[in-house]
């Protein structure tokens, strides 16, 4: 039989879960494959560098700051200076959409918002209203929320105004604040990371912190190093795993 190496970091623990010490850190570079429609910038066969931290049912939020700190160190070693690691938390987004009574549509909203850099806010609004039957006023609230800008401290301070209205939102805000704090402690300069509420990542399995890295002098390339936390590896294995 012949097989191909699939995209999916969970594959690394499939056959050796009883031999690992957690949290397990893994780094790998190799050719991988995924089944999707080939298009510009999206390939079925490509090389990928993986950075993984896997916990046995629990993983500290501090580890969520460890990943972007590694991204910073790698890019710095490459001699790159003008890059930005954008950071957000899916719990903040899910909590905010719950405040608007849009829990059932949160996945559709996040997949649409995730395209805002490519298609612009006007088209994002049109899709929310026309395709997902979201009221225009609520669509405007969504755009205003994800459009909150400023320094990292200013964005986090703006989010504090929503505290107390949704438990998931509050948890996500606590986590994002902790991640921002530890990024500084891990030596990542303020100019190299940004709290950005437009970052959602299009895949539904992300549950916590999400990241996207862009080269500031080459925005046309798009994201060059992305990922996030997900807690659903129990769907694939008999043991509960938390994964970054």
Predicted regions located by residue number:
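A short acidic (Asp/Glu
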Residues: 94-98
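Short, conserved beta-strand segments within well-ordered enzyme catalytic domains
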Residues: 1, 5, 25-28
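Positively charged, Gly/Ser-enriched RNA/tRNA-binding surfaces
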Residues: 14-81, 91, 127-244
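Acidic, His- and aromatic-enriched active-site or binding-groove loops in soluble protein domains
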Residues: 102-122, 215
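Short low-complexity, flexible loop/linker segments enriched in glycine and/or proline
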Residues: 99-101, 209
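Single conserved hydrophobic/aromatic residue that forms the stacking wall/gate
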Residues: 2-13, 243
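Short internal beta-strands
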Residues: 85-87
């Amino acid at each position: 039989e012949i097989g191909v190496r699939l995209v999916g970091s969970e594959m690394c623990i499939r056959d050796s879960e009883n031999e690992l010490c957690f949290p397990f850190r893994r780094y790998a570079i190799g050719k991988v494959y995924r089944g999707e429609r080939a298009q510009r910038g999206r390939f079925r066969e490509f090389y990928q560098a993986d950075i993984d931290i896997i916990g046995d049912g629990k993983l500290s939020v501090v580890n969520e700051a460890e990943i972007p700190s590694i991204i910073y160190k790698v890019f710095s070693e490459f001699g790159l200076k003008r890059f930005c690691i954008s950071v957000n938390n899916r719990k903040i987004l899910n909590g905010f959409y719950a405040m608007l009574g849009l829990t059932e549509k949160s996945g559709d909203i996040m997949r649409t918002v995730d395209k805002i850099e490519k298609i612009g806010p006007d088209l994002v609004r049109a899709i929310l209203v026309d395709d997902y039957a979201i009221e225009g006023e609520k669509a405007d609230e969504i755009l205003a929320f994800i459009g909150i800008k400023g320094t990292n401290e200013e964005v986090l301070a703006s989010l504090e105004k929503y505290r107390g209205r949704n438990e998931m939102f509050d948890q996500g805000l606590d986590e994002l604040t902790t991640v921002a704090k530890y990024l500084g402690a891990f030596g990542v300069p303020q100019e190299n990371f940004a709290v950005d509420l437009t970052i959602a990542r299009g895949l539904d399995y992300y549950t916590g912190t999400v990241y996207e890295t862009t080269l500031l002098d080459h925005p046309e390339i798009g994201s060059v190093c992305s990922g996030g936390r997900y807690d659903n590896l129990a769907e694939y294995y008999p043991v509960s795993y938390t994964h970054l």
